[in-house]
Amino acid sequence: MKRDKKEQIVQDVAEKIDRSQGIYLTEFQGLSVAKMAELRNEFRKAGVEYRVVKNTLIKKALRDLSSADRLASGLKSTTAVAFGYDDPLAPAKIIRKFSKTNEALKFKMASIDGVVYDADSLPALSEMLSKTENIGRAAGLINGVVSSVPMVVNAVARNLVSVLDQIAKQKQ
């Protein structure tokens, strides 16, 4: 590969890293072409880009990242990078699900918002709720509280009327 082409790839990968909320390194050695296409399709559906890049080019693209040294330690063997643009946890869910049926796919490590996670972190990352899911749950909780306030106020007023009615009956 010519130097110009390599520089273009490094620049392209560096730009993708800057845009990504989550960067995942995987090993895919032994994965068939059909399985790799299936995996890429799953990533595409989730808005995740999956790209095979030479380790030396990834190291150069990671230069400006604060977690570059820790991520560079995972650059051994064949490496493909998953870029999570909108949901930083989407790649973890796909990698975990796919690797259950395809042992050739191995999770190496990830960087989410500058925090590096090793291979043992995949189960925890894949089970975390996304930002959207957390916002939805919080909105549901708030809605539940807001809708129960009028019922509580009505119950207090109803009980007060009942007590006053009983007091009035006792005085008669």
Curated annotation (Swiss-Prot):
Pfam families: Ribosomal_L10 (PF00466). Keywords: Ribonucleoprotein, Ribosomal protein, RNA-binding, rRNA-binding. The keyword rRNA-binding applies. InterPro entries: Ribosomal_uL10, Ribosomal_uL10-like_sf, Ribosomal_uL10_bac, Ribosomal_uL10_bac_type, Ribosomal_uL10_CS_bac. One of its GO terms (molecular function) is large ribosomal subunit rRNA binding. One of its GO terms (biological process) is translation. SUPFAM superfamilies: Ribosomal protein L10-like (SSF160369). The keyword rRNA-binding applies. GO terms for cellular component: large ribosomal subunit. Part of the ribosomal stalk of the 50S ribosomal subunit. The N-terminus interacts with L11 and the large rRNA to form the base of the stalk. The C-terminus forms an elongated spine to which L12 dimers bind in a sequential fashion forming a multimeric L10(L12)X complex. Forms part of the ribosomal stalk, playing a central role in the interaction of the ribosome with GTP-bound translation factors. Belongs to the universal ribosomal protein uL10 family. PANTHER family: 39S RIBOSOMAL PROTEIN L10, MITOCHONDRIAL. This is Large ribosomal subunit protein uL10. It comes from Chlorobium phaeobacteroides (strain DSM 266 / SMG 266 / 2430).
